[in-house]
Amino acid sequence: MFSIKSIQLCRYFSRKSGVLRYWHSAPYLTHSKLLEDKLIRPVDRSKETEKLLRSRLVYQSRKRGILETDLILSGFAKEYLSKYNVELLKEYDNLLNEADWDILYWCTGERQAPEHWLNSRVLRDLKEYLSSKNGVVRFMPEL
């Protein structure tokens, strides 16, 4: 048995085998195994103020992993986050915990979102935001 502490920062994902390999002696784990066993848990943010939550979500929307998602989510955050209540902000926070490519495919309609996101107002707003900006050249909005 191993613990989270045994997982080193140096890791890589092999797309061919679908196995996460960790540096040193940690065992091989599949991505789904990590999610099922909840080995990677989100940070507890239960004591976060609404102002801090909004600020963090704006930052996380701008600093993703791929440029396409950065451009989409940063514009979306600027336009929608000020209108959202705390409940919707937390839903958006959960969406940001998903992989960048998944978010991109779901909001563009390339792939269907998983069942737990099908009735999401945030994902619906994100799709609406993209469809209303058809043909617009995207750029990172100023803070």
Swiss-Prot record:
InterPro entries: SDH, SDH_sf, SDHAF2. One of its GO terms (cellular component) is mitochondrial matrix. Signal peptide: none annotated. It comes from Schizosaccharomyces japonicus (strain yFS275 / FY16936). The keyword Chaperone applies. GO terms for biological process: mitochondrial electron transport, succinate to ubiquinone; mitochondrial respiratory chain complex II assembly; protein-FAD linkage; tricarboxylic acid cycle. It holds the Pfam family Sdh5. Belongs to the SDHAF2 family. This is Succinate dehydrogenase assembly factor 2, mitochondrial. Plays an essential role in the assembly of succinate dehydrogenase (SDH), an enzyme complex (also referred to as respiratory complex II) that is a component of both the tricarboxylic acid (TCA) cycle and the mitochondrial electron transport chain, and which couples the oxidation of succinate to fumarate with the reduction of ubiquinone (coenzyme Q) to ubiquinol. Required for flavinylation (covalent attachment of FAD) of the flavoprotein subunit of the SDH catalytic dimer. It is found in: Mitochondrion matrix. Interacts with the flavoprotein subunit within the SDH catalytic dimer. The keyword Mitochondrion applies. Disulfide bonds: none annotated. Keywords: Chaperone, Mitochondrion. This protein may be expected to contain an N-terminal transit peptide but none has been predicted.
